[in-house]
Amino acid sequence: MAKTLYEKLFDAHVVYEAENETPLLYIDRHLVHEVTSPQAFDGLRAHGRPVRQPGKTFATMDHNVSTQTKDINACGEMARIQMQELIKNCKEFGVELYDLNHPYQGIVHVMGPEQGVTLPGMTIVCGDSHTATHGAFGALAFGIGTSEVEHVLATQTLKQGRAKTMKIEVQGKAAPGITAKDIVLAIIGKTGSAGGTGHVVEFCGEAIRDLSMEGRMTLCNMAIEMGAKAALVAPDETTFNYVKGRLHAPKGKDFDDAVAYWKTLQTDEGATFDTVVTLQAEEISPQVTWGTNPGQVISVNDNIPDPASFADPVERASAEKALAYMGLKPGIPLTEVAIDKVFIGSCTNSRIEDLRAAAEIAKGRKVAPGVQALVVPGSGPVKAQAEAEGLDKIFIEAGFEWRLPGCSMCLAMNNDRLNPGERCASTSNRNFEGRQGRGGRTHLVSPAMAAAAAVTGHFADIRNIK
């Protein structure tokens, strides 16, 4: 029987499936951070259980670390306790930890792929909703809750029901300057923020194959924002070239054997999907969200929509509420909306290609008066590479703040946050009410679009910035 990539990955990992019961899956990699793991380790301790497979468990600090100092005390009491607990737990249970002073420390979904922890064909879990990022490698990756974190630590398995399948095909080639972030925002604009609920999405089509691994990670990272359980891109030469030579990747003949298997990780011809969505890449322009969920998104050259234009009464009410929170009036051009802060970072857009794209806009320009702009690399290696390329100097000369790695202003869990009423052009993944700080107003954009907003003081079409 013809199978989708998701079905192949799922079936390959079933340990046990009793009749009328949820299948038990083997988990190849477990990524751990300081926020969702303390109670899980406490549970192990209470029952006298070890970590079943410490060699398949990798920990880092990211959510509530300071991006201005490596001092563990810098982000408050709760952050300090969580980080100290992670240090204690990893030491006690034999788990490798990339702590604040480790050169590989960074956002968990940047660190995993970068170190070759993430490989095609794997099942990967983390106590974090954006674990879908790793699906860019053709791995089945999804977020789990703290009780499930404990279950995986104890057994290296997890009960998981089968999801529905969804194919999203982006046909043709994207125009110059259009990024994976624009593509995925356009997709969510079409499906809505619940369009993928109950599904595992496979992205395909020429525009997807054209993306680098970093672009594919951005794409899969945001699949959760349309309600999907996980996202996949079938592995190809782009994937194999990225993985080759990384710290935890197979070496020599083992790598060649792995690639031979990875090449089988494709959806079979004739396999059927429960849902199919198609977009034309050439129709996608730079995207900016205007509301309080990622599906409330328009082209940078559009006007803020009028809630009355939505036929669905639920959408209309949602739009009215969103505009009131965002402090926007219907009908005004988006390019006239001024911003207070800019955040370039997060597990969506903090990799080296993202920073290069932002630096290209920032070079030779200055951050607009009254705007605070942060650039937060996703990991120690990203920061080191950016500095080797001189990107830090470009940003600093333009008036951006060059920070240490961490989740930073993506979520109000550390010192980087918005004040009430402040408007931010952000490369992160969620524009919910209060996500970046109580009363903060978040607009999601690509790194180049964020840099353009920083230097102009408002949203601007990067295609018009010479």
UniProtKB/Swiss-Prot annotation:
- Give GO MF terms, alphabetically: 3-isopropylmalate dehydratase activity; 4 iron, 4 sulfur cluster binding; metal ion binding
Give a short account of what the protein does. Catalyzes the isomerization between 2-isopropylmalate and 3-isopropylmalate, via the formation of 2-isopropylmaleate.
Q: Does the keyword Amino-acid biosynthesis apply?
A: yes
Q: What does the cofactor field's note say?
A: Binds 1 [4Fe-4S] cluster per subunit.
Which pathway does this polypeptide act in? Amino-acid biosynthesis; L-leucine biosynthesis; L-leucine from 3-methyl-2-oxobutanoate: step 2/4
**What catalytic reaction does the record list?**
(2R,3S)-3-isopropylmalate = (2S)-2-isopropylmalate
Instruction: Please give the name of this protein.
Output: 3-isopropylmalate dehydratase large subunit
Instruction: Cite the record's note on assembly.
Output: Heterodimer of LeuC and LeuD.
Binding-site residues for [4Fe-4S] cluster, renumbered to this chain: C347, C407, C410
Look up the EC number in the record and give it.
4.2.1.33
Q: Keywords, A to Z?
A: 4Fe-4S, Amino-acid biosynthesis, Branched-chain amino acid biosynthesis, Iron, Iron-sulfur, Leucine biosynthesis, Lyase, Metal-binding
